[in-house]
Amino acid sequence: KPDRNCSSDICKEILTNINSAQSTIDMAIYGYSSTPAIEKAIKNAQARGVKIRLIYDVDSKNQNIYPDTFKFVNLIANSKNDGGIKDSNATMHNKFYIFDNKTVITGSANLSHTDMSGFNFNNIIVINSKTVAEIYKSEFEQMYAGKFHSAKNISERNEADGFKIYFSPQDKALTNGILPVIREAKTYIYIPIFVITENRVVEELINAKKRGVDVRLISDALNASKKYSKIQILREAKIPVKVENYAAKMHAKTLIA
């Protein structure tokens, strides 16, 4: 069962970086559900002079999917959201943190108790690189200045220290980042994923299977039987898809090739 404790390795990593931050923390999150250790760390960081800024998602009614989001917003004076923009149905679905302009944490985990407790399965990556942090900072500054979704400028730079970084929608992450990796795979493609709906991804996975690549997926059960899911198409192409059916969510969005 999920709890409110910061018991997962993911939460502990985020907490450690909040506690060790010396000057700045910039966060772009989908939403928040209460994890007391995170709230305490944020309060302590601000008390020792760390400047914290927050960007979060709201819908067309200025609401957030998580009930504790606005409680979290009230802890942080410097907060902005994507409300009131022309793309009213678009979602600010980021989950990234920039610490002291030198460390970036990003991945599939929301700042929710179901993810922070380790109940749901997620992945994060911790990148200790000032140049990568600069790229994320540029994206953050656009949103903090009120540019969201289709209003954002294309990133001036998307490579640093061995990483390729694409922000949606402006950098065309699917076309420029994901599809080329699938097309160039020669041995295997392993994908743990919450849901797969994109026709172009399915087409390229089937093409990879046909050229002898070992393609395998693990999908969350919640979406597996929905009309928009492409699992059946993949299975008909002889691609094995395991559907996780335990109580929690397979919430990862990962491609290994």
Residue ranges and their predicted role:
Residues 1-22, 31-183, 203-257:
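HKD-type phospholipase D/PLD-like phosphodiesterase module
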Residues 28, 192:
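Short alpha-helical functional segments enriched in proximate histidine and acidic residues
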Residues 194-196:
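Long, repeat-rich segments with strong aromatic
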